[in-house]
From Swiss-Prot:
Protein name: Large ribosomal subunit protein uL23
GO terms under cellular component: cytosolic large ribosomal subunit
Ranges in a coiled coil: none
One of the GO biological process terms: translation
Family annotation (NCBIfam families): PRK05738.2-4 (NF004363)
Complex and partners: Part of the 50S ribosomal subunit. Contacts protein L29, and trigger factor when it is bound to the ribosome.
Function per UniProt: One of the early assembly proteins it binds 23S rRNA. One of the proteins that surrounds the polypeptide exit tunnel on the outside of the ribosome. Forms the main docking site for trigger factor binding to the ribosome.
Keywords: Ribonucleoprotein, Ribosomal protein, RNA-binding, rRNA-binding
HAMAP family per the UniProt record, alphabetical: Ribosomal_uL23_B
GO molecular function: rRNA binding; structural constituent of ribosome
Keyword rRNA-binding set for record: yes
Organism: Thermodesulfovibrio yellowstonii (strain ATCC 51303 / DSM 11347 / YP87)
InterPro entries tied to this protein: Nucleotide-bd_a/b_plait_sf, Ribosomal_uL23-like, Ribosomal_uL23/eL15/eS24_sf, Ribosomal_uL23_CS
Family: Belongs to the universal ribosomal protein uL23 family.
C-alpha cells in the first residue's frame, strides 16, 4: 500500500487538540486496513519526525436517521501517534 494512502486526514476535535498540547500526541484518521507498523513508517516518512508509539482505535458505525429511513455511517479507524520528546509537528500548530 502506498504511504500517501495510509494517512487520510488529521482529527481536529477538542480532545485531540488537548492531547497535542499536553502529551505531544497527534490524532489522525487512517485507512481501515493498516496496522501500527505501517502507520508509524508512513508518518515518519511523510512528516520527517520520530514516532515513539502508535495506538489504533476502531470506530464503529453509528445509526443515523435520514427522513423515515435509518442508515449507518461508515466504520473508520483512528491512530493516536505519540511523538518522541523534543519532536514537534508544525502542521497542527495554527489550529
Amino acid at each position: 500500500m502506498d504511504i500517501y494512502s495510509i494517512i487520510k486526514k488529521p482529527v481536529f476535535t477538542e480532545k485531540a487538540l488537548n492531547l497535542k498540547e499536553s502529551q505531544n500526541k497527534v490524532v489522525i484518521e487512517v485507512h481501515p486496513d493498516v496496522n501500527k507498523v505501517q502507520v508509524k513508517k508512513a508518518f515518519e516518512e511523510i512528516f520527517k519526525v520520530k514516532v515513539d508509539s502508535v495506538s489504533i482505535i476502531n470506530v464503529k458505525p453509528k445509526i443515523k436517521r435520514v427522513g423515515l429511513h435509518f442508515t449507518k455511517t461508515k466504520k473508520t479507524k483512528k491512530a493516536i501517534v505519540t511523538l518522541k520528546a523534543g519532536e514537534k509537528l508544525d502542521l497542527i500548530e495554527g489550529v
